[in-house]
Amino acid sequence: MDKSKIRNFSIIAHIDHGKSTLADRILEITNTVSDHDMDDQFLDQMDLERERGITIKLNAVQIKYKDYVFHLIDTPGHVDFTYEVSRSLAASEGALLLVDATQGIEAQTLANVYLALENNLTIIPIINKIDLPSADIEATKNEIEEVIGLPTDNAVCISAKTGLNCEAVLAAIEKYIPAPKDADDSKPLKALIFDSYFDEYRGVVMLIRIFEGELKVGDEFMFMSNGQRYFVSELGVRSPKETKKKRLEAGEVGYVAATIRDAREVSVGDTITLVNRPAEKALPGYKKKKPVLYTGFYPIDTRDYMELKESLEKIALSDSSITWEQETSKALGFGFRVGFLGMLHMEILQERLNREYKIGIIATSPSVEYDVHMTDGSIKKISNPALLPDRTFIDHIDEPYIKAEILVPNEYIGNVMELCQNKRGIYINMDYIDANRSRLIYEMPLGEIIFDFFDRLKSLTKGYASFEYDLIGYKTSDLVKVDILLNGDKIDAFSIITHKDSAYSKARDLTQKLKEAIPRQNFEVPVQATIGSKIIARETIKAYRKDVTSKLHAADVSRYKKLLEKQKAGKKKMKMLGTVEVPQEAFLSILKTNIDKKK
């Protein structure tokens, strides 16, 4: 294969800027997919992606254009899936920067552009949705030049929806994106694993980009991180259906199967090389993104525990950003503490476990990881509020802080600043991008933004604001643990860590929500929120009242009183012996409720 005719590229875009639609048009124009087989969001193969209209998983497809071979590596746009984007960019030489002409640059787009620049990729600006009346092409070009510092001389203006000028995108890829560097088949094999998934028949299937050397069916290869060896059983490319090949060359993107049954042996970002002629040095791979959010996952049926563990291992093949470890809850039994990149990431995984693996789970209230400084000088990392030590042994608690960059229309600046203030944000800076939009910089506790910050930001600005954040370290805060007691018993799965100033309002919201979610029992159930031994909020779930006097004559007063006294005595006994049955909906309601009430 002529290496000068290979082009490897990704598409960078914010949600709803038309990335999946542009990918569809490229597949159509190049006849990679026939009209008969074509569906909207063709590369978004998961049902969840189609339902939500977002890309969750990266995808890779080989496209023939003239005498060129293009490898399109599709990427997600949501802030929670930045890790997927970084993996796609590591396997590319260039990127299409897709910007909506009606909305301009968004914060998440900026973050992904910086990732592309760090990888030394060639970036081609593509201005989309020019068919809409509100499109402002010149303003969008100016924004790309001023905000990103990227020249727009080679910018292509298109409508991915109608297909207008989409041919020019292919010509720009051919002209501006460089061919793979140092793509020499004769060198020792160096191939980057940028994704993987589990197949029931073939075992672990890896998506790879070959930088140097070649790989053939029957070759014995090894992972450079752990030295594990396997023989290639199947090779091929996706175009977009899997097409088997005898070999993959330097510069190509394809898949490899080797009947690997143990999912833990494959690590995304690892380098594979041949056993008989190994490479001296592994490829750089990429920096693993650390989870920012932790929650407990417990199977509804305790017999599904091992099945849940195996399912998490399989999902981790294609989503190596999740972490998990075993934990035990007095209320819920055996489960796992799972780490995520955000709330959407968590919801998607929960949905995948339910749909793909048929496992029903209960998720506890999410939390961030705190540094707990003990009075003896030691530091404990706590992500499960139930494990927070007694206050008498704690010197102080540090919580993670982020630097948030918010792009907002000028008319909504006041609303956004108030929201940040309510989230304990520290104002750092503000600058004007142009006459209509500004950039706000705030430092905020990570724990304040993981629940509902993104949704509230969108609702306060009618969907026009966007934000991106980076972790900047830990700061000491006045934090307390709020415990929930049901009928006097502490339910560890409901515990939360929060700032002292908002503890009372959050406790009221929690008790109120539990009162609504837990069905009435045959006895009265107090729902209490406590800090230490102090009760700070209480609700009562009223008991059912059985009408024991319904058969009596109205005049039979003594009998009437006797039956009521008997019922009262029976209820006291039930209250003493009874345990409260908490339905799954109670956990879901706490998870989905806006715990931080709008102030």
Curated annotation (Swiss-Prot):
Keywords (A to Z) from UniProt: Cell membrane, GTP-binding, Hydrolase, Membrane, Nucleotide-binding, Protein biosynthesis
Domain tr-type G positions: 4-181
Gene Ontology biological-process entries: positive regulation of translation
PROSITE patterns: G_TR_1, G_TR_2
Catalytic activity of the protein: GTP + H2O = GDP + phosphate + H(+)
Domain of life assignment: Bacteria
GO cellular component entries: plasma membrane
First-tier enzyme category under EC: hydrolase
Compartments reported by the entry: Cell membrane
EC nos: 3.6.5.n1
Topology in membrane: Peripheral membrane protein
InterPro entries: EF-4, EFG_III/V, EFG_V-like, EFTu-like_2, G_TR_CS, LepA_C_sf, LepA_CTD, LepA_IV
GO MF entries: GTP binding; GTPase activity; ribosome binding; translation elongation factor activity
Binding site for GTP: 16-21, 128-131
UniProt cross-references to PANTHER family, sorted A to Z: TRANSLATION FACTOR GUF1 HOMOLOG, CHLOROPLASTIC, TRANSLATION FACTOR GUF1-RELATED
Function noted in UniProt: Required for accurate and efficient protein synthesis under certain stress conditions. May act as a fidelity factor of the translation reaction, by catalyzing a one-codon backward translocation of tRNAs on improperly translocated ribosomes. Back-translocation proceeds from a post-translocation (POST) complex to a pre-translocation (PRE) complex, thus giving elongation factor G a second chance to translocate the tRNAs correctly. Binds to ribosomes in a GTP-dependent manner.
Protein family (similarity comment): Belongs to the TRAFAC class translation factor GTPase superfamily. Classic translation factor GTPase family. LepA subfamily.
NCBIfam families cross-referenced by the UniProt entry: lepA (TIGR01393), small_GTP (TIGR00231)
Protein name: Elongation factor 4
